[in-house]
Amino acid sequence: MDIGVHVLGSVTSNENESLGLKELIGTKQDRSGFIGEDCLQRSLKLARTTTRAEEEENLSSSVAAAYCKTMSFHQGIPLMRSASPLSSDSRRQEQMLSFSDKPDALDFSKYVGLDNSSNNKNSLSPFLHQIPPPSYFRSSGGYGSGGMMMNMSMQGNFTGVKGPFTLTQWAELEQQALIYKYITANVPVPSSLLISIKKSFYPYGSLPPSSFGWGTFHLGFAGGNMDPEPGRCRRTDGKKWRCSRDAVPDQKYCERHINRGRHRSRKPVEVQSGQNQTAAAASKAVTTPQQPVVAGNTNRSNARASSNRSLAIGSQYINPSTESLPNNRGVSIYPSTVNLQPKESPVIHQKHRNNNNPFEFGHISSDSLLNPNTAKTYGSSFLDFSSNQEKHSGNHNHNSWPEELTSDWTQLSMSIPIASSSPSSTHNNNNAQEKTTLSPLRLSRELDLSIQTDETTIEPTVKKVNTWIPISWGNSLGGPLGEVLNSTTNSPTFGSSPTGVLQKSTFCSLSNNSSVSSPIAENNRHNGDYFHYTT
């Protein structure tokens, strides 16, 4: 309060007393850290420019002195710019603040470390020169000229600035504008400019930026969530270990760990190859229920004529004599227990190929069943097994069993379904004579699987309702069915068959009960014939 009284008194006295006031105010301002010479010059100028009465002059002087006092206490910003605290009085008067003057643009090049040359100024973005400079503000301590306190820190914002960018962002914008100039001029951009920008954005410095880009950095995602080693599998054990493999493109994990967390059922099911399916289908044979046939014994003294028949099981059943016929297609079902013999073992009897009445067994057609050389007057004839055919493979004569061997034979009777796609023609048996004709059936020459059957019984009947065709299969020594019988012993022994019913009887066996119907038999009923196959 004393300072205010002295100021008011000194101003109202006269100009001669202004020196004492200058000394008093100067000492007070020096102690407070503020230069009071500016306030004195302002008060003197205001006193000289007034043309009013002495009271008005005293009032204006007192207001100016009080303003200088408050500014000294609050460390306010002076209302006059001065280039240096040691400038002259005339210089200070010329630089007195005028609110109508436009502020000069502030050059940031000296703060960001860029060159102040004309070329560098031209390389800057146009809008950089139009942004107003930051304003001055009061500070409790620091540096400045004439009491101007200004914080020009490179790391943060201006305290009182409402501008859109910080100084660091200004520097980056200038650098990007320079890079843009290089690009528009089709000149390679120096690596120093690019590296500095990457380092400013990427927190790890030496490591390359992540695949998330720079946008996530500005959004606040560049922190602990960023992968320090992009491109590496992120599979860990929850501790320090991490998989060293490279990750699959656009994925987090490598090929080994990419399916680790998924359920097993989501993996694609491996489709079996066509070969596996074909092999499975070929190995699976379709079998039908086999019904036993009760065979009756007949006279042992009947003569038996034997002829070889071979039935091949495979995908194709082709008779060499009728390969060109279009009706050799059909569906045939055979049991899976067949004889496995080499191709050259069965003796093939092909006679009367010019016969126009082929007989189809399944979808196998033969030339004819009529063979006048082997005609017998007995009621039935059979297809028997012969092991001597392997020894006499080149011989085309029939091997007949002696009468002694037929008494103790154990025979297997079972029904075999026979299906045909085309109607089969029958042999000429119009006179209903008990005449047996034997002719071998060549069913297929392609496969090694063959079935040798015993003598075929052709029995004339009178339009019977029963249309089943039972075929008796003989037992074999080594296999389930179809092995050749040993003819060197008088009473050969036979192994038991896993399928069918074993019956102790002679070759002359008649069976009236059967279980499988065939279109062959249906065609034969019209001619009065009934085919009966048994052994």
UniProtKB/Swiss-Prot annotation:
Highest taxon above the source species: Eukaryota
Region feature (Disordered): 260-308, 417-437, 514-535
Pfam families per record: QLQ, WRC
Tissue spec. comment: Strongly expressed in actively growing and developing tissues, such as roots, upper stems, and shoot tips containing the shoot apical meristem (SAM) and flower buds. Detected in young leaf primordium. Also expressed in mature flowers, but weakly expressed in mature stems and leaves.
Primary localization class, coarse: nucleus
Motif Bipartite nuclear localization signal: where in chain: 232-242, 260-267
Domain WRC: 227-271
Keywords of this entry: Activator, Nucleus, Transcription, Transcription regulation
GO BP terms: DNA-templated transcription; negative regulation of cell population proliferation; regulation of DNA-templated transcription; root development
UniProt similarity note: Belongs to the GRF family.
Domain notes: The QLQ domain and WRC domain may be involved in protein-protein interaction and DNA-binding, respectively.
This protein's name: Growth-regulating factor 2
The species this protein was found in: Arabidopsis thaliana
This protein's encoding gene: GRF2
